[in-house]
Amino acid sequence: MEHHGENPKKQVFAIIPARYSSVRLPGKMLLPIAGKPLILHTVERAREAATIDEVIVATDDHRIFEAVTAEGHQAVLTSAEHQSGSDRIAEVANSLPKGSIIVNVQGDEPVISPATIDAAVNALLHDPQADMATTCEPIESLLELLNGNNVKVVIGDNGYAVYFSRSPMPWPRDASLRHGGDPNRAIEEQPELLSNFRKHTGLYVYRREYLLKFTQLPQTKLEKFEMLEQLRALENGAKIRVVEAAAKSIGVDTEADLKLVRAILEAEEKAHEIVA
């Protein structure tokens, strides 16, 4: 863990990694939603965050680059060899000013709340001991808890991440014992137990120098076991501040996600037209 002095004049860059290829939803970054490509909605949300000075899309695809720059937004063509979004944004961050704050905004979250971005950025800016910050959301059902695609985060009383896992954590021992050792049954009969769980979301805020260091570290045992990149940071002693998201976001991974996001953004578009 490194100690970082506070500097209220730090520049804050939102970098949005955007690939064209997607196993479940090919070309999703350019799929039309309410009259514009998905990626542009994400860019606009990031630009609305009060803490963000600049928004940059990092992509290895000319189609995404052209769609973004045609609307006057910044984009950078990166290497096609990157294994993760963190590696992609690190390539861009390497040319940004020293001491900058780097926000990794997932490109496939077109309804992300600008207030969530601000909360995460401010959490890092006001905590000189933290290397990075991220966000979490409440878990509202047993189905959501048991879904391995929903990463759970355990947060200590000090507000730092203790562990991330695809498994339900922490374990409700006493409640489980009262229900024959079955935690699922315990939660079904005591849904208030869900308040003990948090879902990790994909927004990350890094100090530039830590991001560059992190992406040079070799993969760790737990990271490879759970296939969770953030465990590499924890295993190497990073302090990760976790804050509650201002609103639930939706990552577009399936046709069902796309349909839901289209309904939300088209409704917002109609509401704006009525006001205008």
Language model: regions and residue ranges:
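N-terminal glycine-rich phosphate-binding loop and ensuing alpha1 helix
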Residues: 11-58
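A conserved hydrophobic position in a structured secondary element of the catalytic/binding core
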Residues: 59-60, 112, 206, 253
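Conserved alpha/beta core of the MobA/IspD/sugar-nucleotide pyrophosphorylase nucleotidyltransferase superfamily
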Residues: 181-276
